[in-house]
């Protein structure tokens, strides 16, 4: 469907809207830290907005609207990949809630930031490859590399947060 000229504008708009939202999130975080405007509400709402943006993007791209005539996904995504991404977000959000409820801030770490950046590149890249870019082999290979890199970094990020939370979880489970 994406090759039809009447749909190309949708691909352009969707990818640019996602990029503007992702860059806006980065700029807002930078300004909040730079001007010492970090609040408890912001520590909750910013990760929530990140989840909506990223998980929403991946879930939508997994939808049946992005299947070919045989019912195969044209996005390069598989259901298990999106489950890994969404599952990681739910797990880390739960750990963040647990930590914040205990009075301990739960800031993003290096792997969490790398994950957000790569996911924020992967979603619009996938969107752009729904149009004429499908005919350019290196763009499709780059899409697949980005998808697999996203999955790898998502898992590494989950493991890093679990490792950092291990002591607090063990302490809480004992008493």
Model features per residue range: what roles?
Residues 1-175:
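Alpha-helical transmembrane bundles and membrane-interface segments of multipass inner-membrane proteins
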């Amino acid at each position: 469907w994406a090759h039809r000229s009447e749909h190309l504008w949708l691909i352009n708009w969707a990818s640019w809207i996602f990029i503007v939202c992702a860059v806006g999130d980065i700029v807002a975080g930078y300004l909040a830290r730079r001007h010492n405007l970090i609040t408890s509400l912001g520590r909750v709402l910013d990760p929530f907005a990140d989840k909506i943006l990223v998980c929403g993007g991946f879930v939508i791209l997994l939808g049946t609207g992005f299947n070919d005539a045989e019912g195969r996904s044209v996005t390069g995504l598989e259901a298990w990949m999106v489950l890994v991404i969404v599952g990681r977000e739910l797990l880390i959000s739960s750990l963040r809630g647990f930590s914040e409820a205990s009075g301990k801030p739960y800031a993003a770490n290096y792997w969490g930031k790398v994950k957000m950046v790569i996911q924020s590149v992967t979603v619009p890249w996938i969107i752009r490859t729904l149009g004429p870019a499908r005919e350019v082999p290196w763009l499709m290979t780059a899409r697949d590399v980005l998808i697999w890199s996203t999955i790898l970094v998502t898992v590494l990020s989950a493991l890093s947060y679990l490792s950092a939370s291990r002591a607090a979880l063990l302490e809480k489970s004992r008493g």
